[in-house]
Amino acid sequence: MKKTLKIIGILFLILMGLGSLTKAIVKPVAADSLEEQIRRANRDCPIPVANGVGQVSSISLEDGFIVYKLDYKPEYINIDVYRNNPEATRDMFYLAFLCVNGQGGHSDMMSNELIKRGLGLRIVASNGVSSFTSELSPTYIKEMQNRINVNPTKALHDALKLKFETENCTFPIKIDEGMILKGLGLEDNNIIVEVGIDENLYDVASFAAVSDEFADNIITEANNGDPELGALLDLCKISHTGLTYRLIGNYSKNHYDMNISSSLIRQNRNVPPQVNIH
């Protein structure tokens, strides 16, 4: 099942990029200009994730926008999904910005700085074959700041919901013999991975016997360098969520949940240093 989860995606990388710049702005060196703060953040680039599957390639100031350039290997991101859902994608980026902006007691410091200077955010994502651009104008940032008032964890959970709603159009996908990835979602404090099971090949109830071993194996494979699982567990850690594989029988519709608790993930994964979320 592990090999199917290509959800490294936009959200995690933009959290890392935003986190890098937020640190530079809220902890500036004396007499630093904003331009110098951006240059300092850019010196951390490229910021890789998941063994180089994706990266924040650069952070720069161009034409009144702070520009984040994100690059992925082609098979790890479906550019069309985001290009075809521009408003949801922009809102997801804003919620990620709100999450990072609210960390460490910094409140609205970064958004206020952007509004004061009349600057927006621009995200340019590429998979080496095609690309798309999403812009958060100063007007949009100010409107959203006036309309949305949530804590960082709630902002990130809302961003996750938007992410999954946007990307679920790519499912179902066959992931193994007798297994189909049906979709991703957020339920309570767990990321849910729905997997359809062919009951001619598997007894859904039999998975209960290997539940603990399954959780340990997922953690071990992630820590041994599996890019997809590593990114997925890191996303769970920074969003304070657990991970649930929901196995659903294709005939009976009975299901069994294979759970990896948030506490287990947090004990075994480190928060990426660019993301100031604990």
Map each language-model feature to its residues.
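C-terminal partner/receptor-binding element of secreted or periplasmic proteins
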Residues: 117-154, 240-278
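Hydrophobic membrane-insertion alpha-helices, especially the h-region
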Residues: 7-23
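N-proximal, solvent-exposed amphipathic alpha-helical segments enriched in charged/polar residues
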Residues: 24-65, 73-77, 147-187, 200
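Mature extracytoplasmic domains of secretory-pathway proteins
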Residues: 60-110, 182-235
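Short glycine-rich, low-complexity/disordered patches
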Residues: 48-60, 99-128, 173-185, 224-251
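Positively charged n-region of N-terminal signal peptides that target proteins for export
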Residues: 1-4
